């Protein structure tokens, strides 16, 4: 009997140790690393010896948008989510000494991945994070194992009605129009981005409240105004992004909030034109679909990555 009890105690200790190790590997940790003039903040979860997913946020958000998704996938994947310069906790150098363009943000993210040792990874791209991620894919196609696009557009037909006014601004970027687009930083505008088209009561206030705080820190509005104007560089690159897909045929999953007025469902459906085997899914949500459907999106990602990349 004593031997049986001893064996059971030892087994329990092993199971407890295993559970603690798993918990340590899946918990969220927070870090900063210097890249050029920026101290880049990032979140990390999952064991480093598991397949890596780089998570690239949108406007006006930051890596906080992945707070629910990362723990759901950290048991099988290594997840990294940085904040871009002028977003979240990453330092925002003065505009006189730092160019706020999508190409420069992509260069920062590129150097960031190299500094923390990422050599092969899948990407989750959303909103502003999409043209940043697509640049990385064009520059280093050998590093990209798969793309998960959540309302991350690269097609003209994916641009909603609001982009008509943006295009007019890009063609005639007056100071008056620049000031008008500062309405994007108003609290009611940000709340609308989060809640439009989502099931009632499914979006908590934490995300949009935090975004409103960060985007209205001193100097950041003008940095964001620079990016609103420079978004035209992303649209100009759409043909090159599409050529990357046709040439390299990366495994591609598009998960779209079907009620998003900014990047409409046609943008998701267009992926099959360039990647015939792309998986396309729609969820009954809006632009920030993770807020209401993170569990479903995590499930789709897990199944897609295990079936197509890490089988």
Regions found by a protein language model. Give the residues of each.
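Flexible "cap/lid" subdomain of the alpha/beta-hydrolase fold that forms the substrate-access gate
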Residues: 22-28, 34-40, 45-48, 52, ...
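Hydrophobic h-region of N-terminal signal peptides that target proteins for export
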Residues: 11-18
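Catalytic histidine-centered segment of alpha/beta-hydrolase-like enzymes
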Residues: 286-298
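A short, Lys/Arg-enriched amphipathic alpha-helix followed by its capping loop at the start of a domain
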Residues: 68-77, 115
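Structural cue for short, hydrophobic secondary-structure segments
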Residues: 55-58, 81
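The serine-hydrolase catalytic nucleophile loop
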Residues: 59-69
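Sec-dependent signal peptide recognition
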Residues: 2-8
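Alpha/beta-hydrolase active-site loop signature
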Residues: 60, 85-88, 154, 286-289
């Amino acid at each position: 009997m004593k031997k049986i009890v001893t064996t059971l105690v030892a087994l329990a200790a092993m199971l407890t140790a295993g559970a603690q190790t798993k918990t340590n590997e899946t918990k969220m940790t927070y870090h900063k690393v210097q890249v050029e003039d920026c101290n880049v903040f990032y979140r990390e979860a999952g064991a480093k010896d598991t397949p890596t997913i780089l998570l690239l946020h949108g406007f006006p958000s930051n890596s906080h948008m992945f707070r629910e998704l990362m723990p759901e996938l950290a048991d099988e994947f290594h997840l990294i989510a940085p904040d871009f310069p002028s977003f979240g906790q990453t330092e925002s150098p003065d505009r006189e000494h730092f160019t706020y363009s999508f190409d420069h943000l992509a260069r920062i993210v590129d150097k960031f991945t190299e500094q923390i040792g990422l050599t092969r990874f899948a990407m989750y791209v959303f909103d502003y994070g999409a043209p940043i991620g697509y640049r990385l894919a064009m520059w280093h196609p050998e590093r990209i194992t798969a793309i998960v696009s959540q309302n991350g557009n690269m097609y003209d037909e994916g641009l909603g009605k609001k982009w008509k006014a943006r295009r007019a601004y890009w063609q005639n970027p007056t100071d008056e129009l620049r000031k008008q687009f500062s309405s994007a930083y108003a609290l009611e505008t940000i709340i609308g981005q989060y809640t439009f088209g989502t099931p009632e009561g499914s979006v908590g206030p934490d995300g949009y409240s935090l975004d409103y705080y960060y985007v209205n820190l001193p100097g950041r509005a003008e940095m964001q105004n620079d990016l609103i104007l420079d978004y035209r560089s992303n649209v100009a690159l759409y043909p090159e992004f599409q050529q990357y897909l046709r040439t390299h045929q990366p495994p591609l999953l598009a998960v779209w909030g079907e009620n998003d007025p900014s990047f409409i469902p046609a943008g998701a459906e267009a992926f099959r034109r360039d990647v015939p085997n792309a998986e396309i899914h729609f969820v009954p949500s809006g632009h920030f679909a993770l807020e209401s459907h993170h569990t479903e999106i995590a499930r789709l990602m897990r199944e897609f990555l295990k079936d197509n990349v890490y089988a």
